[in-house]
Amino acid sequence: MKKHLITLIGTFLICVPVFAQQTGSISGKVTGPDGDALPGVTVEAKGDVLPRPRTAITSETGAYRFQLLPPGNYELSFRLDGLGPQSKELRVLLQQNSSVDVKMQLESISEEVSVVAEIPLIDVTSTEIKASIDSEVIEQLPVGQEYRDLVKLIPGVQYSEEETRGPSAGGSGQDNVYLFDGVNVGLPLFGTLSAEPSSHDIAQVSIIKGGAKAVDFNRSGGFTIDSVSRSGTDRYRGEVSYQIQTDGMTGNRDTESDAEFERDRDWSVVNFGGPLVSENLYFYASYYRPTTTRDNRSNLYGAVPDSESTRDEIFGKLTFTPSNSILINGSYRDSDTDESGNSVTAEDRNGTASVGDDATLKILTLDGSWVATENSYLSFKFTDFQNETSSQPDNLLNFPIRSDGTVQLDVNNLDRQGTFSVPQPIAGEDAFNAFIAPLIGRYGFIENGVATGGGVTGVGSTISLNDFNRESFQLAYDHQLGAHDLHFGYQNSSDEEDLARTSNGWGSITVLGGRSTVPDGTPIFYEARFEQQSLEDVAGTISPVINSELQSQSIEINDNIKLNNWTFNIGIVASNDELFGQGLRENSSNLSGFELAPGNTYKMYEVDFDEMIQPRLGATWSPNGVDSVFASVARYYPAASSLPRAASWARNLRRSIRGFFDAQGNLIGVDPVRSSSGKFFQEGLTPRSIDEYIIGYSKQVNSRWTLKTHARYRYGQNFWEDTNNNARSRFEAPAPISQADYIPNLSDFRDEIGGSSYVIAELDDAFTKYYEAGVEADWRGSNSYFKGSYVWSHYYGNFDQDNSTTSNDANVFIGSSFIADGAGRQLWNNRYGNLRGDRRHQLKLYGYYNFNWNGSAGAYAVYQSGQPWEAWDVEVYRRFTGSSSDTSRFAEPAGSRTTSDHYQIDLNYTHNFKIGGRYNIQVAADVFNALDRQTGYNIQNKVNSANFGSSRSFFDPRRFQLAVKFQF
């Protein structure tokens, strides 16, 4: 009842002016010849991306304001009878306010003059750690072609070349929020960046690292990056470009890996925009086609199939102003990606295990704003995100599998049974070593003339269909009342996933060699891990798809109060999350509250509004309008969670299963993976949260120089994970941690409806801490720009979402990872220490200079500390488990070791060949990693696997890119 009441109140508030996500604003004060405030002045704002101009009248205090302006170039004109007219040109930035003050002169001594307004480069009323970057900066710097490439410009955010997981900036790489035209393009339920809109479509970028207000529903546990796409303007403009990077333009890969290939890449872009109906309707359209090929591939296993990736993406946008006070934007993006020969990038993986992928992405947005009065504004946004993906091995096996023992594992052809992990000898295990010797001889790779274990051969293990959807609707109402800027907002969103996953043959196969037994004492020699959806029933059918859903609501109220030299921000965000799975139905007569109902959608858990109240408090003091001291306190409840799938009861019918075989390949037992099934929730869970404290100082030294410095502290707590119900007693949790089960009567629940011995629990004393001290400086000249930043930080704790498995550059379950998954993976098992995202020192410098010969030069430089890592070894926990897996079993404190520091310099030169006043041919050359610093990271840290301590990934070598653009 409480939830519905809050929702109704929020809806009422907004239906009765927010800084809409995709807009900026202009404000200022007009004075007369004597310096006194000048009321009644007509101020008009004309923009190249705003079809119709807007007007405002200055108040009794001479103040004026334009809200909800699309970012772009504007001209302000000021007129009052008896005084000379004035006009000023300026650029409105995304989520930024531009302040323009004007002093008007008597008409008899003044003539209209248009000048470029000197805009303050810092917002002395804001406590946010934020920055805006427009297309002029992006185009003149050595920045890549994808949305992800822009992240490297953010101060204090680690430079990363990982392709899936986001970089860290005081939180998990899965807690960042990525917005494009206000659309959350993060992968539903996982929080990684799933969409890669072309940077050519981006007009401006805005980044908020901390100190967020209760505006735009910011729940990010990391950073939030938003961008606004290009729009049509009052002139027809277009561009055709082609960019290339051949293998010959790429330096030799100076790595420790024996994986070799020749990679060619190119990017094609076409865009065009302009007015459809003058002063009413503008359009913009683009086509983007990046391709990547890897030829002549080889590794320790020999030749590897060539791989290819091709993407075709179209984008269209309309900007409509039916009246001077109404602005409507609509856009649609459609992308199709086809990839073949993937997944074989490691040196020790046979090319026969390659996989092909296909993905489609569709994004629809509709947003609008209405300037109801000079002091009140209403805005709305609707977004629809659809990402359909599929993946299947390039080599498919054609035999069915069963769990009744009628289908054997063909031990004489293990490379035709699934993905086979070749074992390695273990010191002192003579019987085991003798058993695996012929397997290494047949399936191992040859190194120095000797067959060697530790590699992977066979075929790809899994066939997957994975579709993601997100719908979101939000409303916002802003009102200026004296010294108060009031904001009210409501958001409703739904994240969905549909998953069908089957195994190719027996899936993934490992060798236990008789070191473990089934309950009756029979030795296990082989273990296969396969998907239950692969198993046929007596009718020859398999389980249907798993549907998972997360529904969220948020209400926000914010008041920005200006009192003399002080600005206070008081805000609150209240959120409600509902997690839905499949396979159960509510039944109050049962102790568990549920009954089995295959295919039925049920609410597995709810976090109510009163459990996720997020205060946003801040204060700034600016004694002179150019210096500002600020402080803020905020709490964030990150929205991303994988539990709607990971804990769904449907996983009991569609879970991962371990099959155990004897030396001849006879199935002697099966054991559903306990963490891969439906789970109950511990009672009284507190949602995970991030508390943040900031103090800072900013100063506009002069019209060109700005300086910012801050200190920030973040504390993460109340982390949820799936874990053994009896983990605390079974794996000897230290005092003062309780030895009790998380759910004392779990066995009674399971007697009714089954389920896992694992539960979703709030892990005892789980935490992260992040300390940061940073300084930034900006310099803007008439033909140049420079930005420098240095950040010291320390990120540590005992819960590392970024370091839970072997391949962390992936969509890892949030709330159901390897953390706390059985023996050796509990938080008291060496997990306290430096986290994977810790980068103690980071320096970034970038800028550009425009020459007087139609050329420009840009540069980007970064230095950062290395990546923490530690050894993993199951033998440390041998008395607790018979497993052979080192994965996520820390043999020493987290982050005990660190890779080498990384630094690199990227360069750009651009030259324009102007043809008349309308056309331009632009040639641009980029050099990335000019010093060819190929630092290794992503260490192979499994003690019992080949090449312990060696780097599995390296920063890309020196590479050149050449682009030609025809602009008109």
For every predicted segment, state its role:
Residues 237, 260-338, 355-384, 573, ...:
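Transmembrane beta-barrel wall of Gram-negative outer-membrane proteins
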Residues 406, 433, 442-453, 583-614, ...:
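Solvent-exposed loop/turn elements at secondary-structure boundaries
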Residues 59, 82-84, 88-105, 110-231, ...:
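Periplasmic N-terminal accessory/gating domains of Gram-negative outer-membrane beta-barrel systems
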Residues 48-63:
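Short, acidic Ser/Thr/Gly-rich low-complexity loop/linker segments typical of extracellular
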Residues 117, 240-246, 285-289, 330-334, ...:
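Transmembrane beta-barrel strands of outer-membrane/channel proteins
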